């Protein structure tokens, strides 16, 4: 069933839901650039004001996946994405990127989907470039990277070219819209497992149920109650877990895993170079908060990837990957592998 853009806008004004097929139609218009900037801006703002439903987000993510340049991965076992929505305003170093190296070193395959920093001082793309990684790979090269190194970085603009049709509107609006939460839902490699950090407590239950509708296997959506879009050391973390088709919501604390609750203040960085230094320090097994929060998040990712039986088991595997030097070696391995494709 189709709906006109004007009807959709009226629906948002009346705080009524746009149904699945209607949302598919609208989103395709946006992704093809067939809506005027005024209409596109009005609809995505209207959705934000009325609050997007699980069904609307799932439909939008379905279309964004349709328009993506996909990465074909042959073996889906222990395959995980570690990603945050960003926008948490914490300005910490790239914890999920550091966790990628540890998670891969401990036996998972990681497809990291990311971009340059917008709200943060250093996005995943920025810190990977600072480390010497070539982020500008084609889809087949990313697939080769995952097969060879256990890691692949998908630079969002290379995989979502249709997003250029809404980029100017989003930039001019300058407020969060549905597109801020679609990125983590649209991994171009289709990783069935995921550790996803979100910027608001309400999104925990929403995003995990969107992933349920999209057919994901094992997903942990997390929100640190100190405002972090990661598993936090500074507060309890809300978790929405999808496993075997069922959703469970619960809370975890650093002390549950023998970790001390400490402030995340020392994790703040001003730029990608500072983030690089902190990331390498953690992977070099330097004692401190950076190493502990990477261990905690990598351990959670290893549980999501089904490499570990529990978060606690995952943390133990993460500790071993760091202490053995395997996690640090993964950085050099990814740099070497991706540099051969330098154009």
Curated annotation (Swiss-Prot):
Q: Name one GO biological process term.
A: L-tryptophan biosynthetic process
SUPFAM superfamilies linked to this entry: Nucleoside phosphorylase/phosphoribosyltransferase catalytic domain (SSF52418), Nucleoside phosphorylase/phosphoribosyltransferase N-terminal domain (SSF47648)
A single GO cellular-component term from the record reads: cytosol
Which cofactors, if any, are listed as required?
Mg(2+)
Residue positions annotated to bind 5-phospho-alpha-D-ribose 1-diphosphate are 84, 87-88, 92, 94-97, 112-120, 124
| Keyword Metal-binding attributed | yes
Q: What is this protein called?
A: Anthranilate phosphoribosyltransferase
Species source reads: Burkholderia cenocepacia (strain ATCC BAA-245 / DSM 16553 / LMG 16656 / NCTC 13227 / J2315 / CF5610)
The uppermost taxa in this organism's lineage are: Bacteria, Pseudomonadati, Pseudomonadota, Betaproteobacteria, Burkholderiales
